[in-house]
Amino acid sequence: MNLLDPFMKMTDEQEKGLSGAPSPTMSEDSAGSPCPSGSGSDTENTRPQENTFPKGEPDLKKESEEDKFPVCIREAVSQVLKGYDWTLVPMPVRVNGSSKNKPHVKRPMNAFMVWAQAARRKLGDQYPHLHNAELSKTLGKLWRLLNESEKRPFVEEAERLRVQHKKDHPDYKYQPRRRKSVKNGQAEAEEATEQTHISPNAIFKALQADSPHSSSGMSEVHSPGEHSGQSQGPPTPPTTPKTDVQPGKADLKREGRPLPEGGRQPPIDFRDVDIGELSSDVISNIETFDVNEFDQYLPPNGHPGVPATHGQVTYTGSYGISSTAATPASAGHVWMSKQQAPPPPPQQPPQAPPAPQAPPQPQAAPPQQPAAPPQQPQAHTLTTLSSEPGQSQRTHIKTEQLSPSHYSEQQQHSPQQIAYSPFNLPHYSPSYPPITRSQYDYTDHQNSSSYYSHAAGQGTGLYSTFTYMNPAQRPMYTPIADTSGVPSIPQTHSPQHWEQPVYTQLTRP
């Protein structure tokens, strides 16, 4: 090994040099011989020991290198270098002494650093092509191979430097820079902020992911209580309603999955999220959502449950208020109702008739049928919803997020279908009127929304549609779900059930 030869020579030479030179890194010591010797190599000038090294090859190289620069330049360089110590390691004591005004005092070199510094100088001279990183690796390996006797000179020199350092800086205290901890803190803070920023989007995406999960997902979502059973749903306890955007975040994190990029993420359980709290963030973010974008995800059937609509469609569908065609838009309008009043209007026309009917009719059954014709085109008319479990199932898929979870609490089996049937306009209409308190600012935007508006009305606009998110809302639906079996019955019951849960469980921020 060519490399080893110089190293072995170095150790011998260093033993000599170390005893002679008080500090291998002392620039003043190095100033003695190097300059007069006229050696043009800068590195050698700074190292007294290196002057003692055999200079066969290095000298030849120096000759060729020196030719490149005029003598005056070389002399100027060596002159400058005389007073400057290039050691990467803590500077020699004297240099430190001169730079005491500098705030940072370097630590004294340890034995390995003494060795590495001297060896790097020597090798850098002899093998200028060596990459510094490779050089360092090799020096480390060699150091490990050295035996105690070979290491002794370096150990002694390091001790001498330490003693000297202590003299020069009696009050010196090693204070490692704490940048890393700061960075970690910053990173944590950044993460937190990122999460807060992400959460609204993440939530939407999660919703998207949610709605696609078909009835199975819905049944899983059923109730906050059952929630734990959800295979997809995050294991969040149902009692986290007050969490801000955090719940969504937490859900994502709990699952240990990256925030949903493609809506594949298991649904965030909005039931645990207080819609009111989410609304501001969400709404602000929602503006970026394109209703058409969501529409593409809608199944041709118009089951709003499809992820694209995120829950907008889901909700609309779940309510069965929006038509299949309308669902995408209505979903959009549900989502966007606050932001984009315009989208709702087109859907509202078909839906509007049901809405008016709904509030007035506690029976809801009769209005239901009238409403059904307009809505049937929409998405499994409400009537169909209640009447046809199969279809409603599909629609239910839409509702999967909304009703299933909440209604399913009670319905569990047919949460989707059942939810729908109860959702049928009749149910909504009776329940809706009571629900249309100020909460439901939505109603203005969504006539048809009125059905959801109780949900949407939650005052959270978008989320309101996802009533299941709001614990208060869930109960509202749950009762409906019960009645789902018998649409007519729910109509009478629904208002009370909804209202009661609303009051009892309403958790407004």
Swiss-Prot record:
Q: SUPFAM superfamilies, per this entry?
A: HMG-box
Question: What domain of life is recorded for the organism?
Answer: Eukaryota
Q: Which gene encodes it?
A: SOX9
Provide the domain comment: The transactivation domains TAM and TAC (for transactivation domain in the middle and at the C-terminus, respectively) are required to contact transcriptional coactivators and basal transcriptional machinery components and thereby induce gene transactivation.
Which residue intervals are annotated with compositional bias (Basic and acidic residues) in the record?
56-67, 160-174
Coiled-coil positions are: none
Q: What name goes with this protein?
A: Transcription factor SOX-9
Question: Low complexity bias located where?
Answer: 30-41
